[in-house]
Design a protein with these regions (language model features):
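N-terminal export and membrane-targeting signals
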Residues: 1-10
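C-terminal motif of bacterial Sec signal peptides marking the signal peptidase cleavage site
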Residues: 16-19
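C-terminal subdomain of the subtilisin-like protease fold in secreted/lumenal serine endopeptidases
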Residues: 22-23, 30-77, 82-86, 174, ...
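N-terminal domain-start motif of subtilase-like serine proteases
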Residues: 72-112, 135-147, 232, 273, ...
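Sec/Tat-exported extracytoplasmic proteins
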Residues: 92, 116-117, 121, 125-128, ...
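Subtilisin-like serine protease catalytic core
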Residues: 97-130, 141-193, 208-211, 222-223, ...
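Substrate-binding/access-modulating region of protease and related hydrolase catalytic domains
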Residues: 178-261, 281, 285, 303-320, ...
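Extracellular S/T/G-rich loop segment that most often corresponds to the catalytic His/Ser-adjacent loop
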Residues: 238, 254-331, 335, 342-343, ...
């Protein structure tokens, strides 16, 4: 695999939506309604990295109590892993080739709103199941990009793959809300957005807690309908992780990254830089971003079987790392609120280690916080 940027599998050029697994989506905006007036405003809590956190205020002692509660009574699991997992439990270089956690994600339901999921994949070990399909005939597969990678399967693999996933025992739920490019046909931007809205509403109504949602996708505009649905999902107590987008612009300009309470993840590289290929192609940035996570040279499951390393960068690959870490935390601390999860994730991140991060964007790198 040479470029994750080829994996434009969801409502891209024709439909004005990007599954953020690379590839610059088209500029067809559709209207989608006006965005909420409030945008995604920061709170008064200092982030400690030169920017202001959007999370709920919390003292360092309170955050440490959350981490301690998560670690209590758990035995550690150490695995040999590629760099994108290795870095999650290390504050500094060099990496040691291992990931050690005190939790596995067991008992946590992860809802992956995406192009589909190969639920029979060996990496998922029988832990993946069909939740709902709002875009086409039900099947157990996934869409394929130009390079043969199933976007949703790869994302799910980062979250909960047995060998290459952050939370190797989490339960994965397929929620197909993104139209495959090959199935574009008579679809329209409005129809594509409607499928996403239905997906979000379904998760809000049917989620089994503890639960977390992954949305490795972005519209190329703001949609009041989608943002309203996502806000209700967050308000229902479900942590919701969103990719910052591959447009290399302000993540706040896109839905659902502009929704208050969502956890927005930008992409970093193996050399500890903010991912930016060139020009208008790179990670989203700005005050709506919560933190960075590995988004280049990521290894995970391929639809149809096997695994591969995606050499190119994508925020779609970054977001599921954060989702997996949340699954780890929730498996050890299942009664944590969405707000507590959000605060904990932001405050346990490693600060100031990335290069090429804009001054208007938090310089925070995802960390497991010892869970």
């Amino acid at each position: 695999m040479t470029k994750a940027g080829l994996v434009v599998v969801a409502m891209a050029t024709a439909l004005g939506t990007s599954a953020c697994g690379g590839g610059q989506a088209g500029a067809t905006s559709g209207n989608g309604g006006a965005p909420p007036a409030h945008g995604k405003a920061p709170s008064a809590a200092p982030s400690g990295d030169g920017t202001r956190s959007r999370s709920a205020p919390a003292s360092p002692a309170a955050v440490e109590r959350l981490s301690a509660n998560a670690r209590s009574g758990a035995s550690s699991l150490t695995r040999r892993v590629p760099w994108n997992l290795d870095i999650l439990d290390q504050r500094s270089r060099p990496l040691n080739g291992k990931l050690t956690t005190a939790a596995t994600g067991k008992g946590v339901h992860v809802y992956v709103i995406d192009t589909g999921m190969d639920i029979a994949h060996k990496e998922f070990g029988g832990r993946a199941r069909l939740g709902a399909d709002f875009v086409g005939p039900k099947d157990s597969g996934d869409c394929f990009g130009e390079d043969g990678v199933g976007h949703g399967t790869f994302v799910a693999g980062v979250i909960g793959g047995a060998k290459y996933g952050v939370a190797p025992k989490a339960d994965l739920v397929r929620v197909q809300g993104i139209v495959c490019e090959s199935e574009g046909g008579g679809s329209t931007p409005a129809a594509a957005e409607a499928a996403l809205v239905k997906s979000v509403k379904w998760v809000t109504a049917h989620a089994q807690k503890p639960a977390v949602v992954n949305m490795s996708l972005n519209l190329d505009h703001r949609s009041a309908a989608l943002e309203t649905a996502v806000k209700k999902m967050v308000d229902a107590g479900i942590p919701t992780v969103v990719s910052a987008g591959n447009y290399h612009d302000d993540a706040c300009k896109h839905s659902p990254a502009g929704v208050p309470g969502t956890i927005v993840v930008a992409a970093s590289t193996p050399t500890d830089r903010a991912w930016n290929d060139s020009g208008s192609y790179g990670s989203g940035y700005g005050r709506c971003v919560d933190l960075y996570a590995p988004g280049q040279k990521v290894t995970a499951a391929l639809s149809g079987g096997g695994t591969a390393t995606e050499d190119g960068g994508a925020t779609s690959w970054a977001a599921p790392h954060a989702t997996g870490v949340i699954a780890l935390y929730l498996s050890a601390h299942p009664h944590a609120t969405a707000q507590q999860v959000h605060v904990w994730l932001d405050h346990t991140a490693t600060r100031g280690v990335l290069r090429g991060v804009r001054s208007d964007t938090p310089n925070r790198l995802l960390d497991t916080g010892g869970i």
